[in-house]
Amino acid sequence: MSFYFDKNTDIKSNEKTVHVNINNLMYAFITDNNVFSKKGLDFGTRTMLECLDLKSINGDVLDFGCGYGPVGIYIKSNTNSNVDMIDINERAINLAKKNAKLNNVDVNIFESDIYSNVSKKYDYIITNPPIRVGKEILYKILVGALDYLKENGSLIFVINKDQGAKSTMEYLKNYYNVNILEKNKGFYVFQCQKHWLIA
């Protein structure tokens, strides 16, 4: 499962198109080997997207670890937000660009190792983070988002209870005001707003 946090593109390409229904809206996505959830939208990402209050999402949005692009494309197609999408995986970036065109959305997609190429601040950072990288890097991603959120910005992410949802929530309370947006079959969707004590 090197695709979770890997620039490797040596695995042979085998592009396929999957059709996905999200909140009764149909999307087509080109997927490939060495990208996350290549057979279709995974349950965690679906849980996160379907619980979002799209009317409240506006301004600048970052889709962190975009993969082939379902999160950013869904948000852009349903809001007036300016959406940036990043991933470390070159194949995922190329697929996301193809899928943005396929779904007729105007988004900005670029490669970044965590936040290395991110130069602005966002109203929302939204992610199904790469859990299998381990807690050290996971926390670096989640806490690191603080530096890239605007004053009242929010980090929204999904994580399974078996992957440490509750311990992650408790850890993030040191940095954010944390709310549970959704719980579904072991998946937790958290919204984390900057703690008022943190500039």
Give the residues covered by each predicted segment.
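Conserved SAM-binding loop and adjacent beta-strand
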Residues: 32-49
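Core SAM-dependent methyltransferase catalytic element
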Residues: 183-199
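N-terminal auxiliary segments of SAM/dcSAM-dependent transferases
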Residues: 1-23, 34
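Conserved class I S-adenosyl-L-methionine
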Residues: 160-176
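Conserved SAM/SAH cofactor-binding pocket of Class I
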Residues: 44-127
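Conserved beta-strand signature within the Rossmann-like core of class I S-adenosyl-L-methionine
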Residues: 152-159
